[in-house]
Amino acid sequence: MRIFDPWVGSKYWSAGLGGVRVLILGESHYGIGTESATFTTEVVKEWGQDKRKRFFTTIQKLVAGIGTDVWVTDEQRSAFWEQVAFYNFVQAFTGSEARCRPTQKMWVAASPAFLATIAELKPQVVVVLGIKLKDYLPDIPNSIQVCFARHPASWGFQYGPWQQEIQEAIKVAAESDGSQPDAPADPLASTSLRQPGD
């Protein structure tokens, strides 16, 4: 059963990221209080768009192929999240704070809701954040490009090969769909220097 509805950007269906529907798959939420259907959308809106949180900026740079030395403006951050969908695999709070790990029961229970979400969102690319998550994924249709990256909050995270794999998956999806993307995967029209703390 799905508890946390996915974030679906306003341009996910019409334009996507570089003309491709990209679903970013996180691992889990942590928190206290009541789990609600809108929790994921509230988190992405607050920390991906309205405020600046390194975790969400790292995801944007990873998925959009943006250089680590590039400062992403507030407008660019907001625009990115309108182009993609985001969903957390585990459908329960794992604990009251970060680094609380899902239980085996949580991992197993998450598959049906994830497959229903895939059927609903029809992504062309799924970007899986976290190598451990890879071990628990159910079979995903072969028509979907699936790529993996270390979790952006993991110690010593580097964009390196993960970024390249994601960009290749987006390119393959765009070409196999029979259409070329209208815009590059990198949504930045202009760049500026990186600012401290990001």
Q: In which residue ranges do the predicted regions lie?
A:
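C-terminal capping/extension of enzyme domains
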Residues: 97-115, 133-198
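Catalytic metal-binding/acid-base residues of hydrolase active sites
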Residues: 29, 90, 132-133, 153
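A polyanion-binding, active-site-adjacent surface
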Residues: 1-125
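An amphipathic alpha-helical core segment
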Residues: 123, 131-134
